[in-house]
């Protein structure tokens, strides 16, 4: 049972998240041969003030 955890910054539309789940599932099914029904995709959206790169929060960089 593959479990794929995707972390991204907030701001994607519901349609984009739906497509992400579909495409990640397709890729895992194709590359691992796992049964589609056993593939789990978990999306965690992070607030921009909870994520930093090079010492700067994404919310401060905009």
UniProtKB/Swiss-Prot annotation:
Highest taxon in the source lineage: Bacteria
E.C. numbers: 5.3.2.-
Keyword set, alphabetical order: Isomerase
Enzyme class: isomerase
Active site residues of this protein: 2 (proton acceptor)
GO terms of molecular function: isomerase activity
PANTHER family: 2-HYDROXYMUCONATE TAUTOMERASE, TAUTOMERASE-RELATED
Protein name, as recorded: Probable tautomerase SH1546
Native organism: Staphylococcus haemolyticus (strain JCSC1435)
